[in-house]
Amino acid sequence: MSERKLFTSESVSEGHPDKIADQISDAILDAILAEDPEAHVAAETCVYTGSVHVFGEISTTAYIDINRVVRDTIAEIGYTEAEYGFSAESVGVHPSLVEQSGDIAQGVNEALESREGDTDDLSHIGAGDQGLMFGFAINETPELMPLPISLSHQLVRRLAELRKSGEISYLRPDAKSQVTVEYDEHDKPVRVDTVVISTQHDPEATNDQIRQDVIEKVIKAVIPADYLDDDTKFFINPTGRFVIGGPQGDSGLTGRKIIVDTYGGYSRHGGGAFSGKDATKVDRSASYAARYIAKNLVAAGLATKAEVQLAYAIGVAQPVSVRVDTFGTSTVPEAVLEAAVRQVFDLRPAGIIQMLDLKRPIYKQTAAYGHMGRTDIDLPWEHLNKVDALVEAVKTVL
């Protein structure tokens, strides 16, 4: 009997309370960066019935209308009706933002290396905090992402498209998806075992109608037919009713969907969230750099699966560690890959910011449907422009 294994990942829509919070935090970040690319931002958001609280630490020369940014973001998501219990024009907005701590700022603005005499411009900025970050890539999909999270994201994105186009008129903004994929004894995906979709809806929509529309217009439109069979299980709104949703049903907070944001649990996670943070925060920028490295390693044919760990000390520019784990799939020793990575990629915070051009207002678009593996938007850490350099670096190390 062949060994088969199941793996499950989930995603949530842009109308999920935690994702509303993420999008507001990143909309504020983008608005500030558009005026002041050198700003330091850590913006947190909490949403619940009829209310939005924005708090955190910001150092900037920019002035933005936070009230307007919040309302525009909520309206863009689709919360425009009072009956939803949370609407763009009636919600209360309560900002409470203060300046970044001077103790933190001194280590970010002048790294330990710079204070000790290193005159390289890229050694000037220190990491905004200590921490460990992971990046991952695998050859399961064209975008080099694990299949379960890739399908989960596509399902909730499809729901949003059908809602916004009016093709399914009874849909409301809040939704979740979950996909269980079956793998064979060689860890290759062979079929989809289970799909769970919960979608908020108008009260007059029937369960039968929702089930039929979701299966035909969402699941079958997203998941390739080769992965579906007579044994694939569909759970559509399994509670039986999902009228009350969004912040009326659950409070939401920035940074509570870090597994959805990354690899769906298929790879390790350092614990740091992304949204609302400028690129001096290595929780965000180094996670993007680690994905960039892993994706280029796999695309170069140096491994079929790669996980990259980076780690930093607060106020220090150089990472304290760089690790590459290929789970036995690499074509050369992992120590060679690590040496090649250090040659090709400048992993100081300023080096990452320069390499990926991270002082731009590009973050709000990442705050729903995943920060990694996106094919619908152009993100610099998804580019495959380091493949040749890695191959050449491996040759020099060997």
Curated annotation (Swiss-Prot):
Coiled coil: none
Cofactor annotation remark: Binds 2 divalent ions per subunit. Binds 1 potassium ion per subunit.
Region (Flexible loop), start-end ranges: 100-110
Predominant cellular place of this UniProt entry's protein: cytoplasm
Binding site for K(+): E44
Transmembrane segment boundaries: none
Residues reported in the UniProt entry to bind L-methionine: E57, Q100, D250, K281
Subunit description: Homotetramer; dimer of dimers.
Protein name listed in UniProt: S-adenosylmethionine synthase
